[in-house]
Amino acid sequence: MSLFDKRLSEIHSALRAKEISVTDLVQASIASIKEHDGEIKSVLHVDEEGALAHARQLDERLVKGNEELGLLYGLPAGLKDNLVTKDIRTTCASKFLANYDPVHDGTVSKKVKDADSVIVAKLNMDEFAMGGSNENSGFFPAKNPWNTDYVPGGSSGGSAAAMAARHFYYTLGSDTGGSIRQPAAFCGVVGLKPTYGRVSRFGLVAFASSLDQIGPVTKNVEDSAYVLQAIAGHDEYDSTSANVDVPNYLSALTGDVKGLRIGVPKELIGEGIDPEVRDAVLAALKQLESMGATWSEVSMPHTEYAVPAYYLLSSSEASSNLARFDGVRYGVRADNAANLIELYKESRSQGFGQEVKRRIMLGTYALSSGYYDAYYKKAQQVRTLIIQDFNSIFADYDVILHPTTPSTAFKVGENVDDPVKMYLEDICTVPVNLAGLPAISVPCGFSKNGLPIGLQIVGRAFDESTVLRVAHAYEQTAGFYGRKPEWVRG
């Protein structure tokens, strides 16, 4: 077994016993990127010098033995490139920010450092987190490690692909409409979206502020619990951060689901779901049933409106958030502008990619005078109805379970010229963001052509513990834990 296949708890034991060093781990991470990332292109920037220097400092602390070690001690990590990191380039995979080096850490970046993790690299993504395939990266698209003819998903495609390739012990992504869970499903890894407000967004470059949430991508559920433990909690720098207690997530991993009540929305298990995906999810339900859980079919009647409501709301918020990228304060600055208005126009035209421009235009239109009530206001009303759908189910059930995605990963270029088709791939994930709930994607099978299938488990607000408990119990008995592409080391 490769070092990078071991659980975080096993690695900590090896580090404390001085069987390996943090420097060994970081060097192995960097070597993996150099040797294998040329084809999957999950990594944008490697901070080799800074990561090795940090590793040596951590090794020295262990030798001295007079300091308590952090929860993520010594673990090499990769962060999605929209998480601000001091002195490590942060571009959001956009040419607009191609040379942007932040002068401070975001809260989550600081928390993983405070937990003694080593940030090795920043990871590929769809530009400004807008996309579901990583084909919208302003630099180059990432590929799926299971088959590079296929997309890794998005927008956190680099985070999921890098995890499947075992470049790191964990990665971090952001999830606005499924951007952690969908690529996790496509790449056969675990992706957790916490409750909105559970993890600080300070230092996350905003796409849609009422939807964005940071979360971990890992190779197993236990590791996700470790990482969430380190990054969760109230933050005075984020006004939307929830001031609620953070439980011990590791204590929730009991393996017990006896008496658990599972609701399965008929709208997300029937028509429009690939038969192979449906069969894998039904097999997962049968597995949980054999462990003492019960399940029933339920209804989320407003699901069909979730995708249009999501794209109206997220694009409206994006058009506001991205107004700050104007060529004046930072980023691309056009050279050929005759006046200030021309500077704004030319800088944004040169710096933003096609999908970002499309969503800015859609959002600006939805917010414009005469259309606000017809589009934005109506989308907010649909959001309320979707929240009510979830509340109705959770009155009788502990979790909701359904596919993470309607199909397995699609081929590179397959949907690139059809944005509506691309948007509809989000049907299983966007309702969770609209309601602000926690959800996890765990591997539950493979298609006939060898591509991973993801199972999504949704919980009540701030009940990540139950979500993790169910996911962990299933993972331990399902037989898919530890599977990785054949070429990956170990």
From Swiss-Prot:
One of its GO terms (biological process) is translation. SUPFAM superfamilies: Amidase signature (AS) enzymes (SSF75304). The active site is at 80 (charge relay system), 155 (charge relay system), 179 (acyl-ester intermediate). It is an enzyme of class 6 (ligase). HAMAP family: GatA. Allows the formation of correctly charged Gln-tRNA(Gln) through the transamidation of misacylated Glu-tRNA(Gln) in organisms which lack glutaminyl-tRNA synthetase. The reaction takes place in the presence of glutamine and ATP through an activated gamma-phospho-Glu-tRNA(Gln). This is Glutamyl-tRNA(Gln) amidotransferase subunit A. It comes from Brevibacillus brevis (strain 47 / JCM 6285 / NBRC 100599).
